[in-house]
Amino acid sequence: MKSQTVLISIFIFSFFALHQCMQMDVGEIEGSNKISIGKCVPAQCSVSFFKRDCWCCFRDQSMCSKTQKECESNPRCPPLKF
């Protein structure tokens, strides 16, 4: 009896998901699959082991800044291209 209930629940959920996909516009689907990755990543610049206290350029880890805003605005840090 439990397995039948589970199968019916999965079946209903699948129809709901299919219904939602059919209502979406093609532009929404194409726009939602793009990943946005910043130019900088949090890094460890001090002695403490678990503390991430600075931001470094993703491509060149030697260029670091105290804040993410400073790192993102650095013209020497190239943006990622896919």
Curated annotation (Swiss-Prot):
Domain of life: Eukaryota
Any matching Pfam family: ESF1
Keywords of the record: Developmental protein, Disulfide bond, Signal
Annotated knockout phenotype: No visible phenotype, due to redundancy with ESF1.1 and ESF1.3. Simultaneous down-regulation of all 3 genes by RNAi induces embryo abnormalities.
Signal peptide: 1-23
Residue ranges that the Swiss-Prot or TrEMBL entry lists as coiled coil: none
GO terms (BP aspect): embryonic axis specification; suspensor development
Protein purpose: Maternally-contributed central cell peptide regulating suspensor development and correct auxin distribution in early developing embryos.
Membership in a protein family: Belongs to the MEG family.
Annotated protein name in UniProt: EMBRYO SURROUNDING FACTOR 1.2
Originating species: Arabidopsis thaliana
